[in-house]
Amino acid sequence: MVFIADYGAGNLRSVLKAFEFLGIKAIVSNDPRKMAGYRKVLLPGVGAFGQAMQSLEALGFVSALLEHVDKGGHLLGICLGMQLLLSESEEMGTHKGLNLVPGKVKHFVSSSDKIPQIGWNAVDFSKQSDLFRNVADHSFFYFVHSYYCETESVEAVAATTLFAGQNFCSAIEKNGIFAVQFHPEKSADAGLKVLANFAEL
C-alpha cells in the first residue's frame, strides 16, 4: 500500500487513479500521523516551493517525512515533490527544503528552448535503478517545470534529461529515497511501470 501526502499541492487524484488502474492500494491523506502504518510514501506536487514547504510544516509532514526515511521507509517525490527533497530552492527567493538529498533547485537559464518545459522528453539512465526496472533507457516521460534539481552528489542521480542546454537530474535514487521530475501518472506505460516498481519495492 502507498500513502499519498496531501498538502494542497495538486495532482493527487491523477496519481491515485494511476495506482487504482494498476490495482495497487493507495490512500490520500493530509494527516501525517496516518503515515506511520505505511512503508511507501509518495510526495506529489505542483506549485511554488516556498508555499509547499510552509504547508508541509503547518500540517506536520516535515518531521513525519524525516522520521519515515530515518526508519528505513521508502519515499517517492514527483515533480515539485522531488524538488522539496533537496536542501534549498532559488524559486522566488531562497527557501529551505527537506534536505534529504543535498543540493539546490535552480531555474533554467534562458535558451532557445521555451521555458517552462511542457511536454515529452527522453530520460537517460545514469545507473541501474530499482525505480526504472524493466523500463527501456531513453524512454520518454511527460514534464511540466521551470526549475531543476542540482544534487551535490552524482551518486544520487538515477537519470538525466537534456533541456535548455542543461543535462539535468531528472530522477534520484539513494538509500530508499526516490524522486522523478516528470509526471509518471501522465507518462503512459513507462510512467505506470515506474509507479508499479515503487509500490513493489
UniProtKB/Swiss-Prot annotation:
Domain of life according to the entry: Bacteria
Intracellular or extracellular location(s): Cytoplasm
Principal localisation: cytoplasm
Main function: IGPS catalyzes the conversion of PRFAR and glutamine to IGP, AICAR and glutamate. The HisH subunit catalyzes the hydrolysis of glutamine to glutamate and ammonia as part of the synthesis of IGP and AICAR. The resulting ammonia molecule is channeled to the active site of HisF.
E.C. designation(s): 4.3.2.10, 3.5.1.2
InterPro entries noted in UniProt: Class_I_gatase-like (IPR029062), GATASE (IPR017926), Imidazole-glycPsynth_HisH (IPR010139)
A GO molecular function held by the record: lyase activity
Signal peptide location: none
Reaction(s) catalysed (UniProt annotation): 5-[(5-phospho-1-deoxy-D-ribulos-1-ylimino)methylamino]-1-(5-phospho-beta-D-ribosyl)imidazole-4-carboxamide + L-glutamine = D-erythro-1-(imidazol-4-yl)glycerol 3-phosphate + 5-amino-1-(5-phospho-beta-D-ribosyl)imidazole-4-carboxamide + L-glutamate + H(+); L-glutamine + H2O = L-glutamate + NH4(+)
Subunit structure as annotated in this protein's UniProt entry: Heterodimer of HisH and HisF.
GO cellular component: cytoplasm
GO biological process: L-histidine biosynthetic process
Annotated Glutamine amidotransferase type-1 domain residues: 1-201
UniProt pathway annotation: Amino-acid biosynthesis; L-histidine biosynthesis; L-histidine from 5-phospho-alpha-D-ribose 1-diphosphate: step 5/9
Active-site residue numbers: 79 (nucleophile), 183, 185
Keywords, in A-Z order: Amino-acid biosynthesis, Cytoplasm, Glutamine amidotransferase, Histidine biosynthesis, Hydrolase, Lyase
Protein name stated in the entry: Imidazole glycerol phosphate synthase subunit HisH
